[in-house]
């Protein structure tokens, strides 16, 4: 067999011989053995935990949960991500070997969800921190939807090119921008407002003469009427 040219197959080739390429072989081995790192922070992770049971049995897809990012090639984020958790999430992603993939599960992970409304400590989408391959909306998504997302990721891996996959992804990674915070005085400090105790000089004042001029005793009959 010539290592430079493609082998010539004829009708005499046995059925047990499989002709393929290195790219397809690499993609097949990758999609058949996805080892996920479960990054669950909220209620969406409970739905993913139901996949471990015998009803859905996610082991048939070759998914083996790992506790170390150095042994995982898929990170599944489920739940709200806060500003304090953002550096930890990015660090876990950086520790994963190439090639690596990300599934964003749930509305809180994709857009921040209801926790992002008037919140200064919630990240409005993990795609501002790490690149996301598959978005899985829902609050929370059903286990069937998680299986569908894994199937779509497997199809994406099957269409990848080997050279593009092993290429470092330093230029394609996106990180969160620096958020500018402004110091605002809290109205509930337990202290009296100085403006109420000491009104500004621009406030109109009543002179002493005017005060005593209109000050007169009022009878009870006038109060009743």
UniProtKB/Swiss-Prot annotation:
Main localization (coarse): plastid
The GO terms this record gives for MF are: 4 iron, 4 sulfur cluster binding; iron ion binding; NADH dehydrogenase (ubiquinone) activity; quinone binding
Catalytic reaction equation(s): a plastoquinone + NADH + (n+1) H(+)(in) = a plastoquinol + NAD(+) + n H(+)(out); a plastoquinone + NADPH + (n+1) H(+)(in) = a plastoquinol + NADP(+) + n H(+)(out)
Give the UniProt subcellular location, in the record's own words.
Answer: Plastid, Chloroplast thylakoid membrane
Q: Tell me its cofactors.
A: [4Fe-4S] cluster
Keywords from the named record: 4Fe-4S, Chloroplast, Iron, Iron-sulfur, Membrane, Metal-binding, NAD, NADP, Plastid, Plastoquinone, Quinone, Thylakoid, Translocase, Transport
Pfam (any one): Oxidored_q6
Binding positions for [4Fe-4S] cluster per the UniProt entry: 43-44, 108, 139
Uppermost EC category: translocase
Q: Per the record's keyword annotation, is Zinc-finger included, yes or no?
A: no
- EC number(s)? 7.1.1.-
Q: What PROSITE patterns does UniProt report for this protein, alphabetically?
A: COMPLEX1_20K
Its placement in the membrane is given as: Peripheral membrane protein
Cellular component GO terms held in the UniProt record: chloroplast thylakoid membrane; respiratory chain complex I
Regarding protein family, the annotation reads:
Belongs to the complex I 20 kDa subunit family.
What is said about its interaction partners and assembly? NDH is composed of at least 16 different subunits, 5 of which are encoded in the nucleus.
Relate the protein's function as given in its record.
NDH shuttles electrons from NAD(P)H:plastoquinone, via FMN and iron-sulfur (Fe-S) centers, to quinones in the photosynthetic chain and possibly in a chloroplast respiratory chain. The immediate electron acceptor for the enzyme in this species is believed to be plastoquinone. Couples the redox reaction to proton translocation, and thus conserves the redox energy in a proton gradient.
Protein name, as recorded? NAD(P)H-quinone oxidoreductase subunit K, chloroplastic
């Amino acid at each position: 067999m010539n290592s430079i040219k493609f082998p010539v197959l004829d009708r005499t080739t046995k059925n047990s011989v499989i002709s393929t390429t290195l790219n397809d072989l690499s993609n097949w081995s990758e999609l058949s053995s996805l080892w996920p790192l479960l990054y669950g922070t909220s209620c969406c992770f409970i739905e993913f935990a139901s996949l471990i049971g015998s009803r859905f049995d996610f082991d048939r897809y070759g998914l083996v949960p790992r506790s170390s990012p150095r042994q995982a090639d898929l990170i599944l984020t489920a739940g709200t991500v806060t500003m304090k958790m953002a550096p930890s999430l990015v660090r876990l992603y950086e520790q994963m070997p190439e090639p690596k993939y990300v599934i964003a599960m749930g509305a809180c992970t994709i857009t921040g969800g209801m926790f992002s409304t008037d919140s200064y400590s919630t990240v409005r989408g993990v795609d501002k921190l790490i690149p996301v391959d598959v978005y899985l909306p829902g609050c929370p998504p059903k286990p069937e939807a998680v299986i569908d997302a894994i199937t779509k990721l497997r199809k994406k891996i099957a269409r990848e090119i080997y050279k593009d996959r092993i290429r470092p992804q330093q230029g394609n990674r996106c990180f969160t921008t620096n958020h500018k915070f402004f110091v605002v005085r809290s109205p509930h400090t337990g202290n009296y407002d100085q403006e109420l105790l000491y009104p500004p000089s621009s406030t109109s004042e009543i002179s002493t003469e005017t005060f005593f001029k209109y000050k007169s005793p009022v009878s009870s009959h006038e109060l009743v009427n």
